[in-house]
Regions:
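Alpha-helical transmembrane-segment detector that highlights a single hydrophobic TM helix
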Residues: 76-92
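Small-residue-rich segments of transmembrane alpha-helices in multi-pass membrane proteins
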Residues: 54-66, 88-90, 112-125
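Alpha-helical transmembrane segments and their membrane-interface boundaries
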Residues: 1-81, 127-128, 133, 149-153, ...
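Short, amphipathic, aromatic/basic-enriched membrane-interface segments that mark the entry/exit
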Residues: 48-53, 100-110
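Alpha-helical transmembrane segments and their membrane-interface exit regions
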Residues: 89-93, 139-149
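Amphipathic alpha-helical interface segments
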Residues: 105, 114, 119, 137-140
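Membrane-helix boundary connector in multi-pass membrane proteins
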Residues: 103-104, 119-133
Length: 163
């Protein structure tokens, strides 16, 4: 009986081959690293969601994609997982939004959007789309760091930009 229990425990931790463990590790590390890049930018600007938050969001999103793939779920099932993940991360991002004392003052929208994009990057990493994750991270980083610089340089107010 004890041998049967031990064999069951061992089978739960077994990985069929080195390729699979390498693939899983690579996807999780890529997700965490690229999420960390966006989190670093937010943290340097003193925003509430920084490196750790973005890394965990990206890695969590990658895990939510990897688990159904490993379980052999259909593409329809994976689609439902992605839909739930997108909605759930939207709820998480809502926590980053703060309403100021003035009714027109809302803070944290960019950080919330950054969390949402970070989750999408994690989903892409979990699906093995490393080039998509790298390009998306680069574009998001440009949006977060270069676009505000352009507005400051051109002395364009946000109300002018929205017209």
């Amino acid at each position: 009986m004890w041998q049967e229990i031990w064999n069951t425990v061992l089978s739960e931790f077994s990985v069929p081959d080195a390729q699979q463990i390498t693939r899983i590790t690579l996807r999780l590390v890529v997700a965490a690293a690229l999420g960390g890049v966006l989190g670093y930018e937010r943290e340097q600007k003193g925003k509430s969601a920084g490196v750790r938050t973005h890394m965990l969001v990206a890695m969590g999103a990658a895990l939510f994609v990897l688990i159904p793939q490993q379980a052999g779920a259909s593409s329809e099932d994976l689609s439902r997982v992605l839909q739930g993940l997108i909605a759930g991360v939207g709820f998480l991002g809502a926590g980053a939004i703060i309403m100021g004392t003035k009714q027109v003052e809302i803070r944290g929208l960019t950080t919330a959007a950054g969390i949402w994009v970070t989750a999408a990057i994690g989903m892409a990493a979990g699906m093995g789309r490393e080039s998509t994750t790298a390009l998306s991270t680069l574009i998001a980083l440009l949006v977060l760091s270069v676009v505000p610089w352009i507005f400051r340089t051109k002395k364009v107010t946000m109300s002018d930009a929205q017209e």
